Amino acid sequence: MALQWTTLGLHEALIASELNLEGKIQLHDGMEPNISVQLAEFGDLPVQITVSGAQLMVSSALWEASQVKDLARFNELALKLNPVNALSNIGLITLAPGRDLYIMFGELSASSDLAHVIEEIRVLADNTIEAAEAFADQLISRVTSNSGVQS
C-alpha cells in the first residue's frame, strides 16, 4: 500500500521537495489543519490544501457571490464549465450567514505520490486564473478576490 498523506507529512514533503514548487508554504494548525501555498509562478496566488482521511483537496478562492451580477446565469455557466474543465471544479462555500464564496477546487487520493499532488496544485492555480479571466464579464466590478485573483 502506498503512503497515505497527513497534513503535517505533506507539508514537510512540499518543503523538502526537489520538484520545485516555488512559493511560500505554511502549515495552519487548528481543528482541521491545512496547508497554504502562495505560488510565485502564478502571481502569488494562494492555494489551500487539506488532507482528510483518504482524500486530499486543493482549492483557491475566486470571489464572493455578492460580486456576481446574475447568480443564476453565473451558476449555469459554471456548471457547464465543470465537465469541460474536468481536473478542477467550481464550488460555493459559506463564509458566514449571507456570505458565500466561489472557489476552484480539485481532489485526489491522499495516497497520491508527491509529483501528482504538486501537479494538481499547479493545474488548479492555472485553472483558477483562467476562470477569473473567463468570468470577468459576470462580475459587478473588477475585484481582487480573497485569492488575490483580479478579474
Task: List PLM regions with ranges.
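Short, aliphatic-rich beta-strand segments
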Residues: 101-106
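Short, internal acidic amphipathic alpha-helical interface segments
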Residues: 59-100
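Ampiphathic alpha-helical segments that act as solvent-exposed interaction surfaces
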Residues: 73-86, 107-139
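Beta-strand-connecting loop/turn residues
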Residues: 31, 54, 98-100
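A short acidic-to-branched-hydrophobic micro-motif
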Residues: 46-64
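Residue-level signature for short turns and capping positions that connect secondary-structure elements
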Residues: 40-42, 63, 109
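Short, highly charged C-terminal tails/helix-capping segments
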Residues: 136-151
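Charge-rich, low-complexity N-terminal segments
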Residues: 1-50, 87-88, 93
